């Protein structure tokens, strides 16, 4: 394995935190899109 050096833990934690935040943003976007689509369909159905 590659030697990551003295700050390996910090760097890996930063990458992990970034990945978690990115996944959270993607999930929130997908859920908001689904909610908006449902609301639009309901609005169009009512006229």
From Swiss-Prot:
It is found in: Cell inner membrane. The keyword Ion transport does not apply. Pfam families: CcmD. It is a single-pass membrane protein. InterPro entries: Haem_export_protD_CcmD (IPR007078). The chain crosses the membrane at residues 7-27. One of its GO terms (biological process) is cytochrome complex assembly. GO terms for cellular component: plasma membrane. It comes from the Bacteria. Keywords: Cell inner membrane, Cell membrane, Cytochrome c-type biogenesis, Membrane, Transmembrane, Transmembrane helix, Transport. NCBIfam families: cytochro_ccmD. Required for the export of heme to the periplasm for the biogenesis of c-type cytochromes. Belongs to the CcmD/CycX/HelD family. This is Heme exporter protein D.
